[in-house]
A protein has these predicted regions:
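Glycine-rich and polybasic anion-binding loops at the starts of cofactor/ligand-binding domains
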Residues: 1-126
Length: 126
């Protein structure tokens, strides 16, 4: 698998064991790898792909996704809201501090493709 050899070359398996709280990888919006440390899950941290977040955490996604910058506010926000695909979903409950980084890797092969991030909840840090 292309991603596995890239992960190995970048030293991700070792970093995941020693210094990352979670790792995700997507190839053209398809999830090829995802993990999160159990202690973060116990604190209520959610780190998954967008499709899983919509299925398993619909209430949180509906509450926040596309709310800070609504699609009607700007043409690029509207475009993003209309055609988004893939992506990582990170939710850190209010007051929780994530001490170890969460790392997402994306490989986009389509020319002109882009990615857009959204940050959720007050007084949370990653």
């Amino acid at each position: 698998m292309l991603f596995r050899s890239t992960f190995d070359r970048l030293g991700i398996p070792e970093a995941e064991q020693t210094s990352l709280g979670g790792v995700g990888a997507q190839y053209d919006s398809e999830v090829v790898y995802h993990s999160i440390q159990e202690d973060m899950v116990k604190q209520g941290v959610i780190y998954t792909d967008m499709e899983t977040a919509i299925r398993e955490h619909e209430d949180i996604v509906k509450e926040y996704f596309m709310k800070l910058v609504p699609p009607k506010d700007h043409k690029f926000a509207a475009l993003h809201g209309a055609v988004w695909s893939g992506g990582s979903f990170v939710y850190v409950p209010a007051g929780v501090q994530v001490k170890m980084p969460l790392q997402s890797y994306f490989r986009l092969n389509a020319a002109g493709a882009g990615q857009f991030e959204h940050t959720l909840d007050r007084k949370s840090t990653v």
